[in-house]
């Protein structure tokens, strides 16, 4: 197997008596785009800052391209970083901001001008060279910050929640642009975010973090469809959680309220009488009994919300509530609160949370 480009090995970080990152391990392949996803305070930015050299690990080591960089200063690591707050120099033009690192490195004026022009073309802002940061929108400023980070041709690109200060439409277009540029340059990238949609849409892999540890590392498909822990299942995507009791472990029978479903092969050592947390994504559930769905539960519609192209329906099943979306059809009246209703699903889509 090829050697990883970035290897974070058993890294721990403590501030006094408080440990914020605990035994964090991750290997990143050359050219890979990996997102650190998690809530505030989970340690994702601290790990990024240790890779950048702004924080020193309390234990463990960080290796880039086979070289131990754990104790190197930030300017010795050949790492580009983009901050949430842009951090552009207000007294410098766009071209001067992009070329700043090149000038510090002692590059010749003609080379700087050529590289700056190339960067402006890459971020599609060639006409902005002589403007100042205050004359730019937030999205344009973040593009300039990205261009400045990649202008020196770093080995590794680090992005610390670069889109969180932007409005929704700009965030979507800019994240796609960042991914496109990253693919074009082939630069190994770590992207920190608390936004699951961002992470799912642009990452090769995602490290979901909680309490200073990596709860799960996997592709977006794996993280969403095969969550390893209850935290990952709840944090990524919308989830319906049902409490059930194992009635027959050998045959995989579980009782939800007073109704039974079969989860053969999914109980993982659970015994008859055990209580389980079961979960279904809304898109895995249909209203009414549907062909091809091997499981169903009966309940009563408790809420109906018209959302335009879809109608969000909540169905009470004993002490559980299940949320699902059904397409809006002008020819079919929406379901009504208080109606009895069946929901159907495939048992293969049911998650057992641990």
Language model region names:
Residues 52:
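Helix-to-loop junction immediately C-terminal to a conserved catalytic motif
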Residues 60-68:
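Conserved ABC transporter NBD signature motif
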Residues 33, 72-231:
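ABC ATPase nucleotide-binding domains
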